[in-house]
Amino acid sequence: MQRSLDSLAGMATSAFGAGTSAAMRQATSPKTILQHIINFFTCGGIRRRNETQYQELIETMAETLKSSMSDRGAPLPENIILDDVDGCRVEFNLPGENNEAGQVIVRVSKGDNSETREIPLASFEKICRALLFRCEFSLPQDSVILTAQGGMNLKGAVLTGANLTAENLCDADLSGADLEGAILFMADCDGANFKGANLSGASLGDSNLTNACLEDSIMCGATLDRANLTGANLQHTSLLGCSMVECNCSGANMDHANVSGSTLIRADMSGATLKGATIMAAIMEGAVLTRANLQKASFTATNLDGADLSEANLRNTSFKDCTLTDLRTEDATMSTSTQTLFNVFYSENI
């Protein structure tokens, strides 16, 4: 029995003190030599049983929090009790009048026997909020609650049309998620992973996407006005028809992205890489592309009036039927054909 209590206490500590994939694997792996032997001859039976218990513990916690709190932003109860978890009582005592330790005290008991652990309050609260987030948006609970960086694990989540205004999604894993039409206005997505996600028609105005990964994502018709995409990864991203007015893409990797039909008026793309990017019928008036790498990028019928391409890499860059009035190209590196095109344009407009 004692080993059972110890195992459950360890699971509770891992799930609600860390919540990561590594913590889940450590908590559900066989511990003793006998368990390893049984696990081997049952083709992972011990691990599967532990994983089932781990998942049930998380689901019980989520339901308990949901029923005891008025909304996701409400203060957590000082005492959270999970009754009958595999015949045991699991209690979480938060810092307060009855707990001056500053940590969350976890107590697993059955009859006269008990096991006690401590977990950091900040981690516990973050994990509880993540569980409540899933409840609010009707997402099934996952045994991996947080990423290794401490963001929410929302991999493959269906959040179409969800209102995520000003949501904290820092370091969240939203790879493969469906966020079509979602509202992420002023959301903090610093370091978030949106690889392969569907963000078509999403509202991302004034959002923070610094160092976010948007590789291979679909963002057709999305609004990114004044969004901060500094250092973001937008390789092979479909940005067709996006509104990116005054968007900050400085230092972003936009190699092979398709920006056709987008509005990038006064966008800051300084130091960005757009190698092999497709830019057709885009509006880029006043865009800043200083020191940008535009090697082999293709500009067709694009308005570059007043854009700044000084010090940019324009080797083998194609400009066809583009508006180039007041374009700045000081110290830009370009192939002979591109230089000839600019010389002809400037001579015709003297």
From Swiss-Prot:
Domain Pentapeptide repeat: 162-201, 202-241, 247-286, 287-326
One GO cellular component term noted in the UniProt record for this chain: host cell membrane
Main location (coarse class): secreted
Pfam families per record: Pentapeptide, PipB2_N
Keyword Disulfide bond: no
Keywords from the UniProt entry: Host membrane, Membrane, Repeat, Secreted, Virulence
Subcellular location, record wording: Secreted; Host membrane
Superkingdom of origin organism: Bacteria
Free-text note on domains in this protein's UniProt record: Contains various tandem pentapeptide repeats in the C-terminal region. The pentapeptide motif is required to efficiently recruit kinesin-1. No position is completely conserved in these repeats, whose consensus sequence is A-[DN]-[FLM]-X-X. The C-terminal 38 amino acid residues are required for peripheral localization of PipB2 and redistribution of lysosomal-associated membrane protein (LAMP). The N-terminal 225 amino acid residues are sufficient for type III translocation and association with Sifs and SCVs, but not accumulation in peripheral vesicles.
Function: Effector proteins function to alter host cell physiology and promote bacterial survival in host tissues. Involved in the reorganization of late endosome/lysosome (LE/Lys) compartments in mammalian cells. Necessary and sufficient to link kinesin-1 onto the Salmonella-containing vacuole (SCV) membrane. Required for centrifugal extension of lysosomal glycoprotein-rich membrane tubules, known as Salmonella-induced filaments (Sifs), away from the SCV and toward the cell periphery. Required for virulence, but not for intracellular survival and replication in phagocytic cells.
NCBIfam families named among the record's database cross-references: PRK15196.1 (NF011743)
Subunit structure: Interacts with the host kinesin light chain (KLC), a subunit of the kinesin-1 motor complex.
Protein name according to UniProt: Secreted effector protein PipB2
Gene that encodes it: pipB2
